[in-house]
Regions:
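Alpha-helical scaffold domains
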Residues: 1-143
Length: 143
């Protein structure tokens, strides 16, 4: 990362460099509620994740940045599984801001956790439709 920038600032600079206005506009028109949408696609985010490597502190910082679509999608890709607790998993799935975020969270992180089935069961009985969706997605990855 750049020496003068925090890791989060450097990542956001990279998002900006990879931005795609057509994708961003399409997501906004489709109802994406993020304040900031760069329009970076998932293969590009996976490339960024590969370059960064696993980093729990940065993953948590990205997940907390719920106003930016790409931050929320990148976070599960760089969270080390061995540092991700069941309590944190519960918080992340409950705070996932979109279907897309749930998809990435379940595929890239929750689906490979030893407690994935327990999280799926807990989500299934939730009143939240998004958490119920998470349960179904998670079940499809662990079956």
């Amino acid at each position: 990362m750049d020496g003068d920038k925090s890791p989060l600032q450097a990542i956001k600079h990279r998002f900006y460099a990879m931005r795609n206005g057509i994708v961003a506009d399409t997501l906004r028109r489709a109802g994406a509620e993020y304040r900031v949408i760069f329009g970076v696609n998932l293969p590009q985010l996976k490339e960024i994740a590969t370059d960064i490597g696993y980093d729990a502190v940065l993953a948590r910082e990205l997940w907390a940045n719920v106003s930016t679509r790409e931050s929320v999608l990148l976070a599960p890709m760089i969270m080390p599984a061995e540092e991700f607790t069941i309590d944190e998993a519960r918080r992340w799935v409950a705070s996932a801001p979109s279907v897309e975020a749930v998809d990435v969270l379940c595929l890239r992180l929750l689906g490979r956790m030893p407690f994935a089935a327990q999280i799926a069961e807990e989500c299934l009985v939730s009143d939240s439709r998004l958490m119920q969706y998470a349960a179904m997605r998670l079940r499809s990855y662990i079956s």
